[in-house]
């Protein structure tokens, strides 16, 4: 048994001091002063304790692309960022489009992951958009179905996939992008792309597919979840669909809340991501969507790449940035410290609301819940240094940025998944 003493937890939006008693995989007691002679006591000295974060959008790259990232490193990077549950996307080799392929990934997760990982199954075989994946045999073992990394272009294929997913009580999770509108773009089609003379990706290529899919989801009776919304039009479509009673939810990534196209200083592949950084007007619409509840959850879209794939110009570099290790801290620094978001809202968007959106038994800090928790030093600040990342991916454009609110200890089902060696070097749980 373990007692965390002198920690602070959120209660009705306020930080209050509580002790937490953990026995095995579960939290058994939360109270003001817990004494138990059989328990190991850890003094948190006023640090903040939150439920372990849940990330429904990560790219762990294994099997197939281990030169970019692997499950061993990705799970430890996630734990360092405070995440105790993650959902790896299916753009792998082999693609998890049948149980035989999925089993390869599940076995590696069992062997190498320090946190809970629930993978996606693909919608189509090989994510090629031509033949359906084996939904029925995948369903008991996957979080949801997605062809993330590309949009499902055929409306009938998406509609029939939604119908099957609904019968299996699974969500369809979509990367929304109409290929006919991309036209080889590498950044947002806007002021900055014109200044840099680079091909742009129009906002409508995202929002038009969301508009199509919410109507298909309504007809199919399916839970439809939109990945990484990035435009004001996308927020508007989701907001109106929710008002119409359609079961649609969506996520936003930290980088789309923090930055816009004008933050891109030069033609540098580290700033290339999909969706791209949009306009300031889009960024403000995303923030408004978070505040009014249109946007349900925050997800990182952690997308590691090898150095040779990112140290290129925008037209040649791979899409994607890493985010697992810095997501909470960047958002805390940018939005909670200035008072734009409450600490309660930010934590809920990464825990409680994720669990509610997908009916998961995680994301709670209460008696009887899993001992998934993260201890955060809200006063500690560091500068982002990719050389210190636990992820194999170093591809972030935020090098040198000062961030506050640093996770220092992460437990998943009562086991240490990450600890700050400076603060907890002598703790062996």
What are these model-predicted stretches?
Residues 195-223, 270, 291-292, 296-298, ...:
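His/Asp/Glu-enriched, well-ordered alpha-helical/loop segment
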Residues 1-51:
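Histidine-rich, glycine-flanked metal-binding segment
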Residues 132-298:
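Histidine/acidic residue-rich metal-binding segments in metalloenzymes
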Residues 56-69, 92, 118-130, 149, ...:
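Active-site mouth loops of central-metabolism enzymes
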Residues 99-116, 164-174, 326, 330:
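Alpha-helix-loop-beta-strand connector modules within alpha/beta enzyme cores
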Residues 7, 313-316, 370-429:
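C-terminal cap of metal-dependent C-N hydrolases
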Residues 7, 25, 46, 57, ...:
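Divalent metal-coordination and catalytic microenvironments
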Residues 45-112:
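Metal-associated gating/positioning segment near the N- to mid-region
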């Amino acid at each position: 048994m373990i007692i965390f003493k002198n920690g602070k937890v959120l209660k009705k939006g306020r930080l209050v001091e509580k002790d937490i008693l953990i026995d095995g995989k579960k939290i058994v007691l939360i109270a003001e002063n817990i004494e138990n002679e059989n328990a190991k006591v850890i003094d948190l000295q006023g640090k903040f304790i939150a439920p372990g974060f849940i990330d429904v959008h990560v790219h762990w790259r294994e099997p197939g692309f281990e030169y970019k990232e692997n499950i061993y490193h990705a799970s430890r990077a996630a734990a360092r960022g405070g995440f105790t549950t993650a959902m790896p996307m299916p753009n792998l080799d082999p693609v998890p489009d049948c149980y035989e392929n999925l089993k390869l990934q599940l076995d590696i997760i069992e062997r190498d992951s320090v946190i809970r990982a629930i993978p996606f199954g693909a919608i189509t075989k090989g994510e090629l958009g031509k033949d359906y994946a084996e939904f029925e045999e995948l369903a008991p073992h996957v979080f949801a179905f997605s062809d993330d990394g590309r949009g499902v272009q055929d409306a009938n294929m998406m509609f029939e996939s939604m119908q099957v997913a609904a019968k299996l009580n699974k969500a369809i999770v979509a990367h929304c992008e109409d290929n006919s509108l991309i036209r080889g773009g590498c950044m947002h089609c806007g002021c900055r792309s014109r200044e840099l003379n680079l091909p742009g990706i129009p906002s409508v290529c995202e929002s038009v597919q969301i508009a199509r899919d919410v109507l298909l989801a309504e007809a199919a009776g399916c839970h439809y979840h939109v990945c990484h919304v990035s435009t004001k039009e996308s927020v508007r479509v989701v907001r109106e669909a929710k008002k119409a009673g359609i079961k649609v939810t969506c996520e936003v990534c930290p980088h789309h809340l923090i930055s816009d196209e004008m933050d891109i200083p030069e033609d540098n592949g580290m700033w290339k991501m999909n969706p791209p950084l949009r306009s300031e007007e889009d960024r403000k619409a995303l923030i408004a969507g978070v505040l009014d509840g249109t946007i349900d959850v925050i997800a990182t879209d952690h997308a590691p790449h090898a150095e040779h794939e990112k140290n290129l110009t925008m037209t040649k570099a791979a899409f994607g940035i890493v985010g697992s290790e810095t997501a909470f801290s960047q958002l805390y620094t940018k939005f909670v410290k200035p008072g734009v978001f409450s600490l309660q809202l930010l934590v809920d968007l990464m825990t409680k609301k994720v669990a509610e959106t997908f009916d998961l038994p995680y994301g709670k800090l209460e008696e009887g819940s899993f001992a998934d928790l993260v201890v955060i030093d809200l006063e500690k600040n560091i500068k982002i240094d990719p050389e210190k990342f636990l992820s194999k991916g170093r591809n972030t454009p935020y090098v040198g940025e000062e961030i506050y609110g640093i996770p220092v200890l992460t437990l998943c089902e009562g086991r240490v998944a990450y600890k700050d060696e400076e603060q907890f070097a002598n703790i062996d749980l």
